[in-house]
Amino acid sequence: METTKTQFESMAEMIKKLPQHTCSSLKGRITLYKYQDFWGLQNNIEGAILAQQSFKARPDDVFLCSYPKSGTTWLKALAYAIVTREKFDEFTSPLLTNIPHNCIPYIEKDLKKIVENQNNSCFTPMATHMPYHVLPKSILALNCKMVYIYRNIKDVIVSFYHFGREITKLPLEDAPFEEAFDEFYHGISQFGPYWDHLLGYWKASLERPEVILFLKYEDVKKDPTSNVKRLAEFIGYPFTFEEEKEGVIESIIKLCSFENLSNLEVNKSGNSKGFLPIENRLYFRKAKDGDWKNYFTDEMTEKIDKLIDEKLSATGLVLK
């Protein structure tokens, strides 16, 4: 479904009337708008509206869902390697020459590519950062499978801070972390508030565990083999005994490792299209747990711990 210039202009006018916040932490270079209870860039909201209006899911579709900077790139790489392993191995995979975001498109960003894949009977999972309550109705109506990856909120905040600073070309001295923390703490962040995003999918997973798999980033890092097997089985591509014996799982883990992907030429020097041109290297910063300790003051730690306890204490979900 093509979107006309008039439709885009109409959406742009509507978005301008929404509640908005100009990010002080990024020196006013980014403005977020609030639509259906989440904050997003103008193109995020345009993409969400178009997906809601025109995306038609199929019963066997699989969606990789996440809040930004929570392990999305890694999850995409793993899922893509799993579903294409009959065609490609660690020496021929398109992941060697494409950033994972080009292999698995976002429904709110690459709708045209997704429709082309559907028309060509090309199956790959799709991805989204959209909150659960904003998803196109067909995804929920057809009980499409979803995999949600989440991460320690403190590391998410630090990763988000650096990503925003880098894409807006702000040096460290001009982008105080304290301001970024404060905005995030008050729920003002892309696709946020973070806890609403997380809890939307979590509560849905409790109601429909057969269609929503929750993966904790730190757990996948600690035990990649078991979690890659869980992922493959859940999305309908389980490993055979022969594959396990031949080391296919280990090959996929190695192919998709941070060490491997971050050192590929495409991910060191390539660029991705978006609201702002984004260097692929920015998707591969550190991938380390606990980097937040280098940024958080004791007061910040206490504030965020108290906030998360208030938001999650009765849910059974653990972030630490």
Curated annotation (Swiss-Prot):
Cellular component, GO, one term: cytoplasm
Gene Ontology molecular functions: quercetin-3-sulfate 4'-sulfotransferase activity
pH dependence: Optimum pH is 7.5.
Gene3D superfamilies per record: P-loop containing nucleotide triphosphate hydrolases (3.40.50.300)
Active site (record annotation): 129 (proton acceptor)
EC annotation from Swiss-Prot or TrEMBL: 2.8.2.27
Tissue: Highest in shoot tips and lowest in mature leaves and roots.
Annotated keywords: Cytoplasm, Transferase
Regulation: No requirement for divalent cations and insensitive to p-chloromercuribenzoate, iodoacetate, or iodoacetamide.
Keyword Lipoprotein: no
Chief subcellular location: cytoplasm
InterPro entries reported for this sequence: P-loop_NTPase, Sulfotransferase_dom
SUPFAM superfamilies linked to this entry: P-loop containing nucleoside triphosphate hydrolases
Domain of life: Eukaryota
Record carries keyword Transferase: yes
Assigned protein family: Belongs to the sulfotransferase 1 family.
Function: Sulfotransferase that utilizes 3'-phospho-5'-adenylyl sulfate (PAPS) as sulfonate donor to catalyze the sulfate conjugation of quercetin 3-sulfate > kaempferol 3-sulfate > isorhamnetin 3-sulfate > patuletin 3-sulfate, but not tamarixetin 3-sulfate. O-sulfation of position 4' of flavonol. May play a role in auxin transport.
Protein name according to UniProt: Flavonol 4'-sulfotransferase
